[in-house]
């Protein structure tokens, strides 16, 4: 469950290490984002020489949340950290690698490029 001012780890190789959520997309009064939801964020920490730099405003898709999510079969999924992948305007990832597992909900929401790059889909 990600909201405004939430900080997330970046799970790709764009050069950003941490982002801060500034808006949850999907309606004027939408408050929370879960796995597979798109947010607008600003880069708070980045490595030198990366494709994004500190202060950039980017769009990202949430791939891991600490808050558990109930699946249609009744099972729950939760992770040890909140993480996101920075995306382009066409919802393809800006980086070329994804680090760590991602939720199966990304496949349902048509983020196939992220799912194919991820080392593990839970």
From Swiss-Prot:
One of its GO terms (cellular component) is cytosolic large ribosomal subunit. This is Large ribosomal subunit protein uL14. Part of the 50S ribosomal subunit. Forms a cluster with proteins L3 and L19. In the 70S ribosome, L14 and L19 interact and together make contacts with the 16S rRNA in bridges B5 and B8. Binds to 23S rRNA. Forms part of two intersubunit bridges in the 70S ribosome. Signal peptide: none annotated. PROSITE patterns: RIBOSOMAL_L14. GO terms for molecular function: large ribosomal subunit rRNA binding; structural constituent of ribosome. Gene3D superfamilies: Ribosomal protein L14. The keyword Manganese does not apply. One of its GO terms (biological process) is translation. Belongs to the universal ribosomal protein uL14 family. InterPro entries: Ribosomal_uL14, Ribosomal_uL14_bac-type, Ribosomal_uL14_CS, Ribosomal_uL14_sf. The lineage of its organism: Bacteria, Bacillati, Actinomycetota, Actinomycetes, Mycobacteriales. It comes from Mycobacteroides abscessus (strain ATCC 19977 / DSM 44196 / CCUG 20993 / CIP 104536 / JCM 13569 / NCTC 13031 / TMC 1543 / L948). Keywords: Ribonucleoprotein, Ribosomal protein, RNA-binding, rRNA-binding. Pfam families: Ribosomal_L14.
């Amino acid at each position: 469950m990600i909201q405004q001012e939430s900080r997330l780890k970046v799970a790709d190789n764009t050069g950003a290490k941490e982002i801060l959520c500034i808006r949850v997309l999907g309606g004027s009064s939408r408050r929370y984002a879960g796995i597979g939801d798109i947010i607008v964020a600003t880069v708070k920490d980045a490595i030198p020489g990366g494709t994004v730099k500190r202060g950039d405003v980017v769009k990202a898709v949430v791939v891991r949340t600490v808050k558990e999510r109930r699946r249609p079969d009744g099972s729950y999924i939760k992770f040890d950290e909140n993480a996101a992948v920075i995306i382009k305007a066409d919802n393809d990832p800006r980086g070329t690698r994804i680090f760590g597992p991602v939720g199966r909900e990304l496949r349902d929401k048509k983020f196939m490029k992220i799912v194919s790059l991820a080392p593990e889909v839970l």
